[in-house]
Each structure stands twice: as structure tokens, then as C-alpha cells.
Amino acid sequence: MAEKKKTIEKFVKEQIKKWEGMYLKKPEKAQTRLPVVTVSSEPGSGGTAVAQEIAKRLDFDYFHRGIVEGIATSAEIRSTVIDSIEKERLSGIEDFIASLVRDNYIYPGIYLEHLLLVVGTIGKHGNAVIVGRGANFILPPDERFSIRVIAPLELRVQNVAKWHKVPEEKARQRVIQRESKRRAFVRQSFNASITDPHNYDLVINTGRMKIESSAESVIGALMAGLGKDT
């Protein structure tokens, strides 16, 4: 656990430096701030690989669910991240969270409150890919482009068996258990359905598309929505 915290602390330290560097750049050299790409995926669908490919191609910061959760659960690391934005922008995040709680009948506990603040802070910096943790339900529409990565169950079971070198029966159990946990987390935390396609800007089926072409499709749709060429 201590080793994991050190890894997250190192990641956050480097990330803060990068954010600070972006703000110090001259306007003509500054990177254009683009919306955060949020990636929700069915277990075994390759959503993490798609997210990593998107981040690599766009030169975006990459936040996987373990990093986001680690930041949200550590008071010291969390405050470092939240302090990276100006008070005026933090106030805007807090106002949006209040409206999110009110409009969606969410009753956040301590962890969810912290998660909302952390994801909201990443959203204000932009130019990032966030995997999981219901990020698409947290960020306002103008700050994120949300995708859902799916695949047929049998393919997902085969993927998990291959990746983790376990029998297919064990892989099936793992897929079903993780899927159930993710559905429950989103339902309990955001009063929403993780499987409803209306909650996403784009749904990708990796049973029909390779990782690279999936990433290309996401980037193409993102840029088209912004009126930019890829």
C-alpha cells in the first residue's frame, strides 16, 4: 500500500509540474486546451488499451482508475491536485458539483465528494484521458467527450483468460463480477446506468474494431465535434 502511495505521489508531482509548465508558456506556444476524454468500458473489452492509445496520439495526460482513486482517497495528494487550480476555477467546480448533487438526487459520502473534486480539477486542466470512476457523470458536457467501449461477452472472457493466464471459467467469473461492481458503483453514486448508450457521446465495439482504429474513430469524432481537422 505504501509503495502504491509513493507511485501515485510521484505521478502527481510530475503532473503538477507539467500543468505549471503549460501555464508558463507564451500564448503562441501554449497547447490548446481540449476536453477530457472519459472512457467507460466493459471488463475485458480493451477499454484501457483504447484509452492509452488515445492519450498517446493526442499527447494527453492519462489517468487510469487506480490513479484517480488513489488521489481521491489520500488527503495529502488530493489537496496537492486541488491546489493546482485558481480559487475562482475551484469555486466553479464546487458550484457544478452542488448542481450535480441537486439535479441528479445524489447523496455523496466522503469518498464521492473527494472523487467529484479530483475529477473536476482534472477537467479544468483539460487535455487528459480518464478511465473509469464515472468521470463522464461528473464532468459537464462542455468539458468532456465520453466514450463507452464494449465487446461480446465471449470475446471479453477470452481476452481476460489470455491477459491474466487463467482458465476461461475463472475469467468469466472475473468479468461478470467486475461488471456487476461497476454497474453498482455508477447506479449508487450517480443514480445512472453505466450501460445506457445515451450517457455517452460515442460507443465503440472492439469486437468489430481493432484498438488502433477504435482510437482513430474517437479522435476523429472528438475533432469533428470541435470543428478541427485530425
Regions found by a protein language model. Give the residues of each.
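Extreme N-terminal, non-catalytic leader segments
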Residues: M1-L34
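ATP-dependent small-molecule kinase phosphotransfer cores
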Residues: E3, A72-N127
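Pre-Walker A (Motif I) flank of P-loop NTPase domains
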Residues: T32-V37, G126
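Glycine-rich phosphate-binding P-loop
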Residues: T38-A55
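Short beta-strand-centered segment that lines the nucleotide-binding/catalytic pocket of NTP-utilizing
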Residues: D61-T73
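Small-molecule kinase domains that catalyze NTP-dependent phosphoryl transfer to phosphate-bearing small molecules
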Residues: G92, P167-I211
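Conserved phosphate-donor/acceptor-positioning beta-strand/loop module used by diverse small-molecule
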Residues: D142-K162, E168-I176
